[in-house]
UniProtKB/Swiss-Prot annotation:
It comes from the Eukaryota. It is found in: Cytoplasm, Cytosol; Nucleus. Belongs to the OPI10 family. One of its GO terms (biological process) is protein transport. GO terms for molecular function: Hsp70 protein binding; nuclear import signal receptor activity. It holds the Pfam family Hikeshi-like_C. Acts as a specific nuclear import carrier for HSP70 proteins following heat-shock stress: acts by mediating the nucleoporin-dependent translocation of ATP-bound HSP70 proteins into the nucleus. HSP70 proteins import is required to protect cells from heat shock damages. It comes from Gallus gallus (Chicken). InterPro entries: Hikeshi-like_C, Hikeshi-like_N, OPI10. This is Protein Hikeshi.
Amino acid sequence: MFGCLVAGRLVQAAPQQVAEDKFVFDLPDYENINHVVVFMLGTVPFPEGMGGSVYFCYPDQSGMAVWQLLGFVTNEKPSAIFKISGLKSGKGSQHPFGAMNLPQTPTVAQIGISVELLENLVQQTPVANAAVSSVDSFTEFTQKMLDNFYNFASSFAVTQAQMTPNPSEAFIPANVVLKWYENFQRRLTQNPLFWKT
């Protein structure tokens, strides 16, 4: 039903089932892992109205399990990338794995998936900094930056009659800035990563 992927390692497609609705993947040598991908294999969908909350578990200094909510996967969102590199020293959160006696090894962390009602999933708050930036947030930032630049540059616009001659200053016509702004917006809409080419 689930898979787990860490860059440079083989895909894990057979989690340990620790309860009817709970699954765990071991992450050996977790200190050297920055991101983890959790995904549905596409063979068995979630039952109607269900999804899977995804947790990261690592042993603290005393060897006790610290669980942190990363996010969730659903039939509509069957995969997610999580950044775990900054979470290895944070506080734990409420989790459904509490009563289970899962073995803890100092160098092995775990990814836990708990099958739950969708209405419960959307009410949970993942630990900060677990989500990887998406194209949507980048696109939103770029759009706000464009708007801010255009508004700033436009606030200095003057008519030719209002210009004071100054041979040491260059002037850019406002229609050139507007043309650039519209062109950049169009390209961003077509391909948010166009600037990489």
